[in-house]
């Protein structure tokens, strides 16, 4: 068929347009495919990012849980070290401080300015010393105490009391013993008793009872001065302790607990890991040690957060605050767990001094009463308010009554101590921080004794029975040293602690 010459150009144009349309359609299909491919890639990337974020959040949350447990676990060891630093950062013994390996002989009771240890007592004169057993043992000599009540509990780095020479256990005669560290083996001089410590760090926290009079202080000072400590290599030789080395970087003013609580997670766990090199965990701590390893805390090794997943480090950084809250909450939660008993607003425990794997219990005692004894030596009933929910308020007045013949049953001594909310003494015009069996109380007509707990004096005629309180929140702590184990006894429940009642 012959095409009209005029139609030929049109046909060619139409063919060209058809070809162009076909090419355009092909390009559109390619573009759509690319867009779809990019969208799929974006969705995949977002999904992967979300998965990574979810995984990071999971790691962070898991690390927070583990780090919180680790913080609680290590709290006693870190607190012991911070306490040691402050108490030994002097050239010579002075006041409540002294170099490593030298006795610190408290000549009077602590006062309201004392901030080295929480919950100090005003019943005994402390005779204490810090020892590093990593190089060699130390030998301690104690004079004849002439029947006076005393005890020399030794705390390892984790605050467990591993030995308690004293009137209850070894009598009051002269005695000599050696404190040896982990892994030490060798011979000791004849007549020297060995007390083996599980850790290189040891705090001998001796207490000698005193009535607080000038005459009795003098008698106790004479006994303190006869107590000696020498390294094994110097036994039987003339020995003069070297002056301590003062580190100006150590904060000597801020309370230990406050310093510990202010440590960030990185500093805290680095210190914990360093201390664990010479203060190894107990065998029973194996499950906890395995948990610590998951967040880079391994006994004998440095803690290096740069080797950890950033999400883990982020989770660990959040641990201090919830851990501190858990520790303080244990005063109430421990009642449910059976670690504390509650009577008439008083909480007390017979699970102190040795803790096993009760890490929260150990941390709480460290926080509010570092240096606590075994229950056979002392029980510390504590009350933060009439019912453990409502707090004591210094703007109000309270009375604690002992019925006739119902003062605390002990073979040692008892006392009632006033603390502020941070467990330190309260400044007052009488410089009185405790009431105890050494006080001459005014009795009621029926033979009972009322103790007045308030900020203002109850009147001159009642001041003998007055325990001064601050104007705000406060805490009461009783001490029953060498508590009776047979009726009447706090231990078996045959004696009850009187309640503290608010009065108008």
Give the residues covered by each predicted segment.
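Bacterial N-terminal signal peptides that target proteins for export
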Residues: 2-11
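A periodicity- and composition-biased signal for non-globular, repetitive helical segments
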Residues: 11-12, 368
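Bacterial signal peptide processing site
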Residues: 23-26
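A compositional/structural signature for long, glycine/proline-rich flexible linkers
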Residues: 35-504
């Amino acid at each position: 068929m012959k095409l009209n010459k005029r139609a030929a150009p049109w046909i060619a144009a139409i063919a060209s347009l058809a070809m162009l349309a076909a090419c355009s359609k092909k390009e559109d299909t390619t573009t759509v495919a690319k867009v779809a491919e990019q969208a799929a890639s974006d969705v995949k990337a977002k999904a992967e990012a979300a998965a990574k974020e979810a995984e990071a959040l999971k790691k962070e949350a898991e690390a927070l849980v583990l780090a919180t447990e680790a913080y609680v676990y290590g709290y006693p060891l870190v607190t012991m070290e911070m306490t040691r630093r402050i108490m030994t950062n002097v050239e010579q013994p002075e006041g409540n401080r002294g170099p490593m390996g030298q006795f610190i002989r408290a000549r009077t009771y602590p006062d309201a300015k004392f901030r080295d240890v929480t919950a100090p007592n005003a019943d005994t004169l402390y005779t204490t010393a810090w020892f590093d057993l990593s190089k060699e043992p130390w030998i301690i000599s104690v004079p004849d105490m002439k029947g006076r009540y005393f005890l020399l509990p030794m705390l390892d780095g984790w605050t467990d009391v591993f030995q308690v020479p004293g009137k209850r256990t070894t009598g009051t005669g002269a005695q000599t013993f050696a404190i040896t560290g982990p892994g030490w083996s060798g011979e000791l001089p004849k007549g020297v008793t060995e007390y083996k410590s599980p850790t290189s760090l040891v705090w001998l926290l001796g207490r000698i009872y005193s009535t607080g009079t000038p005459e009795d202080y003098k008698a106790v000072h004479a006994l303190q001065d006869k107590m000696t400590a020498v390294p094994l290599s110097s036994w039987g030789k003339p020995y003069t302790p070297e002056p301590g080395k003062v580190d100006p970087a150590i904060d000597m003013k801020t309370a230990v607990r406050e310093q510990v609580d202010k440590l960030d997670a990185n500093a805290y766990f680095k210190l914990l890991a360093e201390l664990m090199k010479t203060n190894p965990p107990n065998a029973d701590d194996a499950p906890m040690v395995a948990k610590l390893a998951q967040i880079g805390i391994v006994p004998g090794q440095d803690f290096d957060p740069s080797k950890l997943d950033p999400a883990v480090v982020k989770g660990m950084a959040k641990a201090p605050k919830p851990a501190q809250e858990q520790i303080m909450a244990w005063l109430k939660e421990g009642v449910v767990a059976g670690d504390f008993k509650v009577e008439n607003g008083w909480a007390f425990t017979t699970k102190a001094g040795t803790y096993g794997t009760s890490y929260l219990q150990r941390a709480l005692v460290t926080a509010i009463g570092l240096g606590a004894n075994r229950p056979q030596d002392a029980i510390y009933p504590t009350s933060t308010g009439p019912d453990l929910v409502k707090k004591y308020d210094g703007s109000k007045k309270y009375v604690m009554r002992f019925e006739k013949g119902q003062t605390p049953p002990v073979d040692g001594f008892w006392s009632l101590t006033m603390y502020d909310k941070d467990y330190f003494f309260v400044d007052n015009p009488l410089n009185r921080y405790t009431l105890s069996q050494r006080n001459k109380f005014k009795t009621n007509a029926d033979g009972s004794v009322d103790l007045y707990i308030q900020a203002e004096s109850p009147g001159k005629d009642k001041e003998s029975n007055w325990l001064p309180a601050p104007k705000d929140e406060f805490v009461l702590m009783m001490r029953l040293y060498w508590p009776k184990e047979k009726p009447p006894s706090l231990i078996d429940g045959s004696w009850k602690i009187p309640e503290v009642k608010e009065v108008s």
